[in-house]
From Swiss-Prot:
Lipidated positions per record (S-palmitoyl cysteine): C43
Ranges that cross the membrane: 25-45
Chain's gene name: env
Extracellular-facing ranges: 1-24
Cytoplasmic side: 46-77
Function according to Swiss-Prot or TrEMBL: The surface protein (SU) attaches the virus to the host cell by binding to its receptor. This interaction triggers the refolding of the transmembrane protein (TM) and is thought to activate its fusogenic potential by unmasking its fusion peptide. Fusion occurs at the host cell plasma membrane. The transmembrane protein (TM) acts as a class I viral fusion protein. Under the current model, the protein has at least 3 conformational states: pre-fusion native state, pre-hairpin intermediate state, and post-fusion hairpin state. During viral and target cell membrane fusion, the coiled coil regions (heptad repeats) assume a trimer-of-hairpins structure, positioning the fusion peptide in close proximity to the C-terminal region of the ectodomain. The formation of this structure appears to drive apposition and subsequent fusion of viral and target cell membranes.
Protein name (database record): Envelope glycoprotein
Domain notes from UniProt: The YXXL motif is involved in determining the exact site of viral release at the surface of infected mononuclear cells and promotes endocytosis.
Self-association state and partner proteins as the record states: The mature envelope protein (Env) consists of a trimer of SU-TM heterodimers attached by noncovalent interactions or by a labile interchain disulfide bond.
């Protein structure tokens, strides 16, 4: 009886139903992963889109530079 008084509220649940720990650990992992994905997903996607846009703009600049020749300043004078 003294031991039960010293236990926390969650320890009583685990002692009364041992399957609860298994169920909780089985469900908690995927739920935490889903929560992290929902929180950090938009940030990761935003960084990825920004990186791809930077690379595409760099390729566009390279294509434009290849089409046109640069003029020397001495020839224009």
């Amino acid at each position: 009886l003294e031991r039960q008084k010293n236990q926390n509220w969650y320890e009583g649940w685990f002692n009364s139903s041992p399957w609860f720990t298994t169920l909780l650990s089985t469900i908690a992992g995927p739920l935490l992963l889903l929560l992290l994905l929902l929180i950090l997903g938009p940030c990761i996607i935003n960084r990825l889109v920004q990186f791809i846009n930077n690379r595409v703009s760099a390729v566009k600049i390279l294509v434009l530079r290849q089409k046109y020749q640069t003029l020397d300043n001495e020839d224009n004078l």
